[in-house]
């Protein structure tokens, strides 16, 4: 099960078909082991791939089958992250303003849930908080908190890639093209190093 999980993680960024296959294998193994938390994790992996490929309805149906009351603490962040991401994508592609607003409202709710379950000193918390600031046009505050975290010496390349990409978004929306380019370049470099 753990090996399939590592393969899912390796493939998720560039080969969704393969990552989905490993999520399905995780589900098969979880059934054999009769481990509910493994089943929930595998279902969330499949929902992640579905959401990434635009199968929003199917992803939400799969997530809706998970009983939140029995979900172990270590899976709450992933659970809320998936809902936040899928509703955010649905909002981005909604045709009518009314539907777009509803999806973004749901995105905000799950973003707030994420902030409650992520440790306040974690990268996940900082990225979600910066995302919230960016959505509410508080670009300078988002940039400030991201820069504060960026200067931590223990940051790995994958984390740097995510953080600098979010910084580039803050600068883009602020209208600072130079800052945007600078942090996009740093994000690309960190992404390549982490591959």
Predicted regions and their residues:
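A "functional boundary" signal
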Residues: 1-195
């Amino acid at each position: 099960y753990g090996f399939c999980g590592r393969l899912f993680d390796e493939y998720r960024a560039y080969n969704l078909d393969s990552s989905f296959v490993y999520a399905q294998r995780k589900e098969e193994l979880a059934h054999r082991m009769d481990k509910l938390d493994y089943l929930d994790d595998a279902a969330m992996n499949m929902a992640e791939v579905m959401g990434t490929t635009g199968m929003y309805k199917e992803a939400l149906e799969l997530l809706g089958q998970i009983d939140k009351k029995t979900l172990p603490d270590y899976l709450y962040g992933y659970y809320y992250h998936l809902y936040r991401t899928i509703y955010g994508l649905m909002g981005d592609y909604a045709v009518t303003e009314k539907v777009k607003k509803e999806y973004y409202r749901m995105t905000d709710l799950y973003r707030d849930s994420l902030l409650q379950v992520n440790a306040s000193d974690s990268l996940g918390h900082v990225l979600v908080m910066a995302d919230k600031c960016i959505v509410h046009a508080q670009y300078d505050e988002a940039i400030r908190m991201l820069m504060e975290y960026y200067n931590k010496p223990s940051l790995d390349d994958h984390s740097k890639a995510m953080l600098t990409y979010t910084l580039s978004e803050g600068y883009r929306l602020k209208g600072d093209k130079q800052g945007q380019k600078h942090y996009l370049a740093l994000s690309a470099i960190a992404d390549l190093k982490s591959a």
